[in-house]
Amino acid sequence: LHDALPILGIALGLAVMIIAVSVIVGFKSEVRDKIVGFGAHIQIGNLDAARSYETRPVVVGDSMMAALSDYPEVKHVQRYSTKPGMIKTADAFQGMVLKGVGQEYDSTFFHRHLLEGEFPQFSDSASSNRVVISKSLANKLQLKLGDKIDTYFIQDDVRARRLKIVGIYQTNFSEYDNLFLLTDLYLVNRLNNWEPDQVSGVELEIRDYDKLEETTYEIAADTDENPDRYGAEYCVRNVEQLNPQIFAWLGILDVNIWVILILMIGVAGFTMVSGLLIIII
C-alpha cells in the first residue's frame, strides 16, 4: 500500500489537471464560437459608425465581395444590415436589434441552435416579413411560433412593421439572445432608407482562428484607405476588437489554468516525496 501511494497521488493530480484544463478550454471555445456565430470573425463597416447598431452604411458591391473572397484565409463572406427597434405586444415591450441577411448568409450556427420552426433563406431583393427570434425573447413577451409581432423603428418618424415568427433559436448566450432578431436584408435596408448596395457591413469567416490578427491587418491594409463612392471610409475589426471585455475575461481564465497546473504539480511532487520518505523509513 505504501508503495502505491506516490503513484496514486501523481495519478490523482494528473486527473484533476486534465479535467480542470479541459473544462476551461472547452468553456472558452464555446463562448468564442457563439460570439463568432452571431458576428463572424471579422467585420468591415463604416468608420464613423463606432460600435452602435444604428449604423451608417458603406457600399459593398459584388466586386468588393469577390475581392474579399480571394484572400487565402477567408472562408466565407456575407453582407448584413442592422436596425435598433422595439417589439410591442398587448402587455409588454422590449428593445431589440433587427439584423438583415441575404441569400449568401451562412446559417449553420443558427440551424445548430434552432429549437422550433425554420431558418429561411432570407433575401436582399424582397421582403417576406418573416423573422427568427430567440427563445428568451419569446418567453419574455409570451410569443410562440407563428405569432405576428408589431415592431417599431425610429427614423425621421416612427415606422412600424408586422413580422411573422417562423423560427425560434436558443444559444444560451443571453447577451445576444436578448438582442437579435433575424430577417431579410432587403427589409432592414428599406427601414434605413439605403440604396440596394449599401449595408451596415460585411462579415468574414476565416479558416484558421490562429491567423485572426494577421488576416485582419492584411485586409485592413488593403481596405481602410479606399472610401466608397459616397466618401464613407471602411473600418476592419475582428471579433476580439469588437468584444474586448469578453475576450479579456476569457484571457483571465488562462491565468487560472496556470495556477491550477502549478498547484497540482506542487501537490503531486509533495505526494511523491512523502511516499518515498514513507518507503525509506
Residue ranges of predicted features:
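Peri-transmembrane interface segments
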Residues: A4, L212-E218, D222-F270, I279
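Short, strongly hydrophobic transmembrane alpha-helices
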Residues: A4-G26, G37
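Membrane-embedded alpha-helices of multi-pass transport/permease systems
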Residues: V16, V21-I24, K28, G269-I281
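Membrane-interface junction motifs in transport/secretion proteins
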Residues: K28-D62
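Hydrophobic C-terminal alpha-helix "anchor/cap" residues
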Residues: I35, A67-P72, I219, T223
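A short beta-strand structural signal in non-transmembrane regions
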Residues: I42, A138, D197-A220, C235
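Structural beta->alpha junctions
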Residues: D48-E54, Q170-N172, L204-E213, E240-N243
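A structural signal for hydrophobic secondary-structure junctions
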Residues: P57-V58, D62-D197
